[in-house]
Regions:
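AMP-binding/adenylate-forming catalytic domain of the ANL superfamily
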Residues: 142, 510-533, 549-577
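Conserved AMP-binding A3 loop
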Residues: 40-42, 171, 178-202
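Structural core segment of the AMP-binding/adenylate-forming
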Residues: 53, 57-58, 81, 85-160, ...
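Gly/Ser/Thr-rich phosphate-binding loop
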Residues: 240, 257, 262-270, 279-359, ...
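Conserved pre-ATP/AMP-binding loop-to-beta segment of ANL
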Residues: 27, 141, 146-147, 160-182, ...
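AMP-binding/adenylate-forming catalytic core of the ANL superfamily
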Residues: 97, 104, 114-116, 322, ...
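Conserved AMP-binding/adenylate-forming core of the ANL superfamily
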Residues: 7-20, 28-73, 77-81, 98-107, ...
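Conserved AMP-binding/adenylation subdomain of ANL enzymes
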Residues: 201-218, 226-266, 281
Length: 580
């Protein structure tokens, strides 16, 4: 892996330049497969060059930021690749975002244009009134759209008119920004994490060499391409190493193995929820008719790990841990059930990653009498941190566009005076052998349906809807569900909250995965001396009506309403008879 990075550094190569070498090597090899169409490396190169020349002719230059907002498709890749060839930095926006979250994602990086898919025109229209601070913002649409709805220019016309020759007016640098990937981080609205060419190369090389991916391997990912998982970890194998890759616009559990067979995939990608959905499908012959030799990803729970491997005959699992923006990353290459990676206990100080003790209530690092952090012993949960070395592309931390957000993720004087480390915001545990296991998130962010949910964002939205009433949002565990389901506790002694209005406004303002599934109505909410509302005890109590005496409600999606949650309902949710 390091040899690959050194080679790229010597050549000062960009992602686009590496891809062009692959095109010359095998122009007619299948590059990306989507639905029933196969794109060759030459076709991807030509289309991305047309994108580059199109936007260069329109006046976009190196350093300009442009939002890319569309569902997963081949053009999503060719557009960001093409823009990068002229130094324009694409902001890859979550296609589930709406209204304020969408507008914030666009304005936070001062985008000069929005490239959107015709399938998302309504979302763009709804967010447009919130984008007034961006003067002269231009809109470009790929696919069908009504100019009366959005005054956009058609890329279906502009791109084919452009030259397929490589753009000649820009020479990039591997330390340039390649694109932005949005992450909720630990608090607040979505943050734009900076992905440089060097980081894309490092992440891709890590997956490639640690999983021993060969030239003949074919990948399949059904994960969204705006995410690091699908958009970098899988597609980097295609763009940097020449592997063919099949993609899907939206994940389908019933079609997963059909796609693997169709594309003749040998490697597939997962997240924990995806594995559970696939496992819940009725058994069928296709379960073992595929050629998959490796599945890699994150979040495969120990409780279903062996069952998944046995039923679908998967020889190898590459469970990994990492974050979009961080430098603290590990991978399990030993098929150790439940482990996300390994860290030697023999000489822990030479490792660039570590576990440090944190306060269970505040999440703050615990320091010794020298003012330094304390490493965890085996069995102790601690926050995973990565040592920052600015001169090393593997160990540097580029952070976010927002510098204040970046500073919050850096801890100083971690193990020696003057050093710096990246705070992952996650609790891990190491066993006696050195294997690492994911425990929980330390901050307010929790994961549901494969997405990070920022409690601060949801709390802010609820506060506005309820005219600034006190509320806290947190994640609660639900049996046989990955991640945590959102729950809100609202201070409402007089029970004036209209849950119908609340739900209607939340559906309009938040992505579906961020809408709380449980509601608790409290007389008061306990606060700290600095007026911060406490949620640790609320989270521990979960949504169990035998423990909680406050009124409880759950979201019945069939009826589209919050309904009372009693003991029978609770048991039905826990047993899976009621699906969230």
């Amino acid at each position: 892996m390091k040899m690959f990075i050194r080679k790229c550094r010597r050549a000062n190569a960009t992602v686009g330049e590496i891809f062009q070498r692959l095109v010359k090597k095998h122009p007619n090899k299948v590059c990306i497969m989507h639905e029933d169409k196969k794109w060759t490396f030459q076709e991807i190169e030509d289309y991305s060059n047309q994108v580059a020349n199109c936007f260069a002719k329109l006046g976009y230059t190196a350093g300009d930021d442009v939002a890319v907002f569309m569902e997963s498709k081949v053009e999503f890749v060719t557009i960001w690749l093409g823009l990068s060839k002229i130094g324009v930095v694409p902001a890859l926006i979550n296609s589930n975002l709406r209204m304020k979250s969408l507008a914030f994602s666009i304005t936070s990086v001062k985008c000069k244009a929005v490239i959107f898919g015709g399938e998302l025109i309504q979302a763009v229209k709804d967010a447009t009134p919130l984008l007034k601070e961006l003067e002269d913002l231009q809109y470009f649409c790929l696919g069908q759209f009504d100019p009366a709805v959005i005054p956009a220019k058609s890329l279906d016309t502009l791109i084919p008119e452009s030259s397929i020759s490589p753009p000649i007016n820009h020479k990039g640098d591997m330390n340039d920004r390649l694109f932005y990937v949005y992450t909720s981080g630990t608090t607040g609205m979505p943050k734009a994490a900076i992905i440089r060419h060097s980081r894309f190369m490092w992440l891709g090389a890590g997956i490639h060499y640690m999983n021993k991916i060969t030239n003949d391997d074919v990948l399949y990912t059904a994960l969204p391409l705006y995410h690091t998982a699908g958009g970098i970890l899988s597609l980097s194998q295609t763009i940097l190493f020449g592997n063919s890759c099949g993609i899907r616009s939206k994940f389908s559990a019933s079609k997963f193995w059909d796609d693997c067979i169709k594309y003749e995939a040998t490697i597939a990608q997962y997240i924990g929820e995806l594995c559970r959905y696939i496992l819940a499908q009725p058994e069928k012959p296709q379960d073992k008719q595929h050629k998959i030799r490796l599945m890699f990803g994150n979040g495969l729970r120990p409780q279903i790990w062996q069952q998944f491997v046995d039923r679908f005959n998967i020889p190898n699992i590459g469970e990994l841990y990492g974050s979009t923006e961080g430098n603290a990353n590990v991978i399990n290459i030993d098929n150790k059930v439940g482990a996300v990676g390994f860290m030697s206990r023999i000489i822990p100080t030479v490792y660039p990653v570590s576990l440090i003790k944190v306060d269970a209530n505040t999440g703050d690092p615990i320091r010794d009498n020298r003012g330094l952090c304390i490493r965890c012993e085996p069995g102790e949960p601690g926050e995973f941190v990565g040592k920052i070395i600015t001169s090393d592309p593997i160990r540097q931390f580029d952070g976010y566009v927002n510098q204040n957000a970046t500073k919050k993720k850096i801890i100083r004087d971690c193990f020696t005076k003057g050093d710096m480390a990246f705070l992952s915001g996650d609790l891990l545990r190491m066993d006696e052998d050195g294997y690492l296991f994911f425990m929980d998130r330390t901050g307010d962010t929790f994961r549901w349906r494969g997405e990070n949910v920022s409690t601060m964002e949801v709390e802010g939205m609820i506060s506005n809807i309820l005219h600034h009433a006190d509320s806290v949002v947190y994640g609660v565990e639900v049996p046989d569900n990955e991640g945590r389901a959102g729950m809100v506790a609202i201070s409402d002694a007089e029970h004036k909250v209209d849950l119908k209005v609340l739900l209607r406004e939340l559906w309009q303002s938040l992505p579906p995965y961020a809408v709380p599934l449980f509601v608790r109505i409290c007389d008061t909410l306990e606060a700290t001396g600095t007026f911060k509302l406490k949620k640790v005890d609320l989270q521990k109590e979960g949504f169990d009506p035998s423990i909680i005496k406050d009124p409880l409600y759950y979201l019945d999606k069939k009826q589209g309403a919050y309904l009372p949650l009693d003991a029978d309902t609770y048991n039905n949710i826990c047993s899976g008879q009621i699906r969230l």
